[in-house]
């Protein structure tokens, strides 16, 4: 266990409940708290001011940053649920100031040396599942009972409502809003609201964009871009090319680039279509 006495102060130790089990090779900062009956395995590193609740399991190799709260029953760093996994050393890496609620599961990546990565200031609500090789950027909210399959990429500030599944290799764009109980089989464009079974792009996420502090000028530019893609009679490829030529605003550039890559890059699943 890691303690820090570099400043000549009295050596501190993590606050560990007597029923918790900590592997001798685990590295815990002196300010870490570990609740009753939790198990911290080998090759686990936990940063300052992180609180591990009761009945939590963290297996390694896993790195957890500072200021995180991990609630009862969460399981982090177990082997991936992937038949291709051959026992190689892969990782979970979690950033800072995240809330990981009750019974969340976060699996390691499949390939040796690969990473399942969670960024900073995210909220993962109860019973959410993050499968192997997923990447969740920053300030994402994932609601209760969301199941993320492998290799999903979620950009910052996205909002994923409850009780839904997301297909493997899907990308979910920045500041997108996914409605509850939807079936997400293709990429979710940034700044949009997507919902349904089958899912469809319904509109821009106007409330979310306003709450994020986006300017009226940027909102107006995104509205024009959205209308060109989803509400005009312009053929899709031609509309993308027009956006690429005229995208002066960074948000419109991101919108166009996401759609272009989703539509034409190898390995991408293509964007969810607009409503009919």
Swiss-Prot record:
One of its GO terms (cellular component) is membrane. It is found in: Cytoplasm. SUPFAM superfamilies: Trimeric LpxA-like enzymes. InterPro entries: Acetyltransf_C (IPR029098), Acetyltransf_C_sf (IPR037157), Hexapep (IPR001451), Lipid_A_LpxA (IPR010137), Trimer_LpxA-like_sf (IPR011004). Pathway: Glycolipid biosynthesis; lipid IV(A) biosynthesis; lipid IV(A) from (3R)-3-hydroxytetradecanoyl-[acyl-carrier-protein] and UDP-N-acetyl-alpha-D-glucosamine: step 1/6. Pfam families: Acetyltransf_11 (PF13720), Hexapep (PF00132). GO terms for biological process: lipid A biosynthetic process. It catalyses: a (3R)-hydroxyacyl-[ACP] + UDP-N-acetyl-alpha-D-glucosamine = a UDP-3-O-[(3R)-3-hydroxyacyl]-N-acetyl-alpha-D-glucosamine + holo-[ACP]. Its EC number is 2.3.1.129. Keywords: Acyltransferase, Cytoplasm, Lipid A biosynthesis, Lipid biosynthesis, Lipid metabolism, Repeat, Transferase. Coiled coil: none annotated. GO terms for molecular function: acyl-[acyl-carrier-protein]-UDP-N-acetylglucosamine O-acyltransferase activity; structural constituent of carboxysome shell. PANTHER family: ACYL-[ACYL-CARRIER-PROTEIN]--UDP-N-ACETYLGLUCOSAMINE O-ACYLTRANSFERASE (PTHR43480), ACYL-[ACYL-CARRIER-PROTEIN]--UDP-N-ACETYLGLUCOSAMINE O-ACYLTRANSFERASE, MITOCHONDRIAL-RELATED (PTHR43480:SF1). Belongs to the transferase hexapeptide repeat family. LpxA subfamily. Involved in the biosynthesis of lipid A, a phosphorylated glycolipid that anchors the lipopolysaccharide to the outer membrane of the cell. HAMAP family: LpxA. Homotrimer. This is Acyl-[acyl-carrier-protein]--UDP-N-acetylglucosamine O-acyltransferase. It comes from Synechocystis sp. (strain ATCC 27184 / PCC 6803 / Kazusa). The lineage of its organism: Bacteria, Bacillati, Cyanobacteriota, Cyanophyceae, Synechococcales.
